[in-house]
């Protein structure tokens, strides 16, 4: 069971796109989000072991909610690309994001909640500063949940970089 306290950190809506530039344009035209902090990400996963994914990621805030655009570009990206379905779909809803506050021990305690009813389909780390895991909630909710933890330094760096609208 994932405890209700996990959702106190609900802060993100994640979307997958075939074309991040076109998705950015769509979000600007229709939702007033005029800029995204974009970067390329390559991560080697802990689960599934050795899996590598390459993504272009864009982040922006709409009020207190972070909007994430993800363009899969290489490696094992089925977890992301599968939500697009129709060839003409530009953007597909992928996940809600939950930020785990506190130190690394808080992440480890949070991580212990996951069980077979909430399988981890992707998990990884970036050095000592980032931990993330996606649980598959599609049978009940129709989407994934991304659980993420940042060191205080990483969180501060990101906050400075991500535009707010």
Which residues are covered by each model-predicted region?
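Residues embedded in well-ordered beta-strands within globular domains across many folds
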Residues: 14, 37, 97, 148-149
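N-terminal strand-loop-strand beta-hairpin
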Residues: 1, 15, 30-62
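Histidine- and/or cysteine-centered catalytic micro-motif in compact active-site loops
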Residues: 41, 72-74, 101
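A cross-kingdom feature marking solvent-exposed beta-strand/loop segments within repeated
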Residues: 37-54, 76-88, 93, 128-132, ...
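Vicinal oxygen chelate
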Residues: 1-3, 15, 19-22, 30, 34-35, 62-65, 68-71, 108-165, ...
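N-terminal beta-strand motif that seeds the catalytic metal site of vicinal oxygen chelate
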Residues: 1-21, 91-100, 160-165
């Amino acid at each position: 069971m994932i405890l209700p306290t996990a959702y106190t950190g609900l802060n993100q809506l994640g979307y997958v796109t075939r074309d991040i530039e076109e998705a950015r344009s769509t979000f600007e035209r229709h939702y007033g989000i005029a800029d995204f902090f974009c970067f390329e990400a390559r991560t080697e996963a802990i689960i599934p072991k050795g899996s590598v994914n390459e993504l272009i990621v864009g982040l922006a805030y709409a009020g207190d909610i972070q909007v994430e655009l993800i363009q899969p570009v290489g490696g094992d990206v089925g977890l992301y690309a599968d939500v697009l379905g129709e060839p003409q779909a530009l953007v597909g809803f992928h996940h809600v994001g939950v930020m785990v506050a506190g130190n690394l021990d808080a992440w480890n305690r949070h991580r212990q909640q996951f069980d077979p009813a909430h399988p981890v389909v992707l998990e990884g780390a970036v050095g000592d500063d980032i931990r993330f895991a996606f649980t598959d909630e599609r049978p009940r909710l129709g989407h994934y949940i991304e659980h993420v933890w940042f060191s205080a330094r990483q969180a501060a760096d990101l906050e400075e970089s991500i535009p707010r609208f």
